[in-house]
Swiss-Prot record:
Keywords: Fatty acid biosynthesis, Fatty acid metabolism, Iron, Lipid biosynthesis, Lipid metabolism, Membrane, Oxidoreductase, Transmembrane, Transmembrane helix. The gene is desC. Its cofactor is Fe(2+). This is sn-1 stearoyl-lipid 9-desaturase. It is found in: Membrane. A motif (Histidine box-2) lies at residues 97-101. It comes from Anabaena variabilis.
């Protein structure tokens, strides 16, 4: 792998040790004494809440791209769910993703896939990124919101509070599966959108980058694997544009529409 940057990137040791600690914690899930079906159930439920409702629906389609609107209380709830995925605070996440779309697969892209699969999957997170300084410029719509500021500042403590709740409800096995294993699982599912869907699959549209549609990533990440479609129509709340491109998050948006909780839903114009 070659990282095409003008200067050698510096390792972010805080991030590196943080990710290492979480992965070590996740391995404790494979110790038989930490296994229970209840703990696995908690992990699966939180996988959907934090990865599906939080990251995919909340952070990504609602806040980053504003592909639909919800009442403010629901937006805050979805952003809280995304914050519990422990992928940084919402302001940083949204800003970084907007930068990615502006510079997709070019050197300023934080996870430029031309720098290799490893880099776009996790490498970019363990090095200091110059794009971090641009986040304020890309998040003016949310940066002054006190709820977003609170979640950005205290996302680690919010995760700790969830861990303590799980410890109270089900003991150490709930913490291992519901926090450590679940966080790492959702990490890699999310990261596959940055790596696998810029390498594997098919391209329906010329989006000006290497984005692809990858069915198995779509399964893991609630429809986010139809990434070439998304890059072609970034504003669209629906990513799976063909009948066989199952998009669970789009189905969720449709349900919210029926309930009167999603309005101004934007859809792709495939004639473009």
């Amino acid at each position: 792998m070659t990282i095409a940057t003008s200067t050698k990137p510096q390792i972010n040791w805080v991030n590196t040790l943080f990710f290492l600690g979480l992965h070590i914690g996740a391995l404790f899930a494979f110790i038989p004494s930490n296994f229970s079906w209840a703990a696995v159930g908690v992990a699966l439920l939180l996988y959907w809440i934090t990865g599906g409702l939080g990251i995919t629906l909340g952070f990504h389609r609602l806040v980053t791209h504003r592909s639909f609107q919800t009442p403010k209380w629901l937006e805050y709830f979805l952003v809280l769910c995304g914050t519990l995925a422990c992928q940084g605070g919402p302001i940083e996440w949204v800003g970084t993703h907007r930068i990615h779309h502006l510079h997709s697969d070019t050197d300023p892209d934080p996870h430029d896939s031309n720098k290799g699969f490893w880099w776009s999957h996790i490498g970019w997170l363990i090095y200091h990124s110059p794009s971090h300084a641009d986040v304020p410029r890309f998040t003016k719509d949310i940066a002054e919101d006190p709820v977003y500021q609170f979640l950005q500042k205290y996302f680690i403590f919010i995760q700790i509070a969830l861990g303590l709740l799980l410890l109270y409800l089900g003991g150490w096995s709930f913490v291992v599966w519901g926090v450590f294993f679940r966080i790492v699982w959702v990490y890699h599912c999310t990261w596959l959108v940055n790596s696998a869907t810029h390498k594997f699959g098919y391209r329906t549209y010329d989006a000006g980058d290497r984005s692809t549609n990858c069915w198995w990533v779509a399964v893991l990440v609630f429809g986010e694997g139809w990434h070439n479609n998304h890059h072609a129509f970034q504003y669209s709340a629906r990513h799976g544009l063909e009948w066989w491109e199952v998009d669970l998050t789009w189905m969720t948006v449709q349900l919210l529409q029926i309930l009167g909780l999603a309005t101004n839903v934007k859809l792709a114009d495939k004639k473009q």
